[in-house]
Design a protein with these regions (language model features):
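N-terminal active-site segment of His-dependent metallophosphoesterases
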Residues: 1-69
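His/Asp/Glu-rich metal-coordinating catalytic cores
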Residues: 49, 60-156
């Protein structure tokens, strides 16, 4: 039975303007520490993959530094990470995700689901059906295309 660590809504890059400056800065740092802790937990529990189901980033306009720090924080777990864009960080033609790729910030073990489809994790013999948000607001069933998909050869 596959073992996943499932998480979502990190909202990295969020500004905590309702708090005192020091407290806001501490909350920002705590979010990066939380990603590091998730990586540690994935190792401790021998997870097959970490699934991040939307809103890794709070906005398309986060800094390059924030983008790099997010992906650096994942490095302790060398197994696959699958990240799906959400409504805050939708997979637009030009997005925080395409910027992360241009920056070379995305490690090889991190799979970005920037369009609907299947991500095959061959060493783990897993296929992940991904339905990312490709626009900020959507009203249709993002999983509808999956009904016609067939399992890849050699996968259950």
């Amino acid at each position: 039975m596959p073992k996943f660590l499932h998480t979502a809504d990190w909202q990295m890059g969020r500004a905590f303007t309702r708090f005192e400056t020091e407290d806001g800065a501490a909350l920002v740092e705590a979010r990066f520490e939380a990603i590091e802790k998730l990586a540690q937990l994935a190792n401790e529990h021998q997870c097959d993959a970490v699934l991040v189901a939307g809103d890794v980033f709070d906005a398309q306009t986060v800094s390059d530094r924030t983008i790099r720090r997010v992906f650096n924080a994942t490095k302790a777990f060398t197994g696959p990470w699958v990240m799906l864009p959400g409504n805050h960080d939708a997979a637009l033609a030009e997005s925080v995700w395409t910027r992360a790729e241009r920056l070379g910030a995305v490690p090889e073990n991190v799979h970005l689901a920037l369009q609907p489809g299947v991500i095959d994790l061959e060493p783990q013999r897993l296929s992940i059906l991904c339905a990312p948000l490709t626009q900020r607001h959507t009203y249709g069933d993002l999983t509808e295309p999956f009904s016609s998909y067939e399992s890849p050869e050699g996968f259950p």
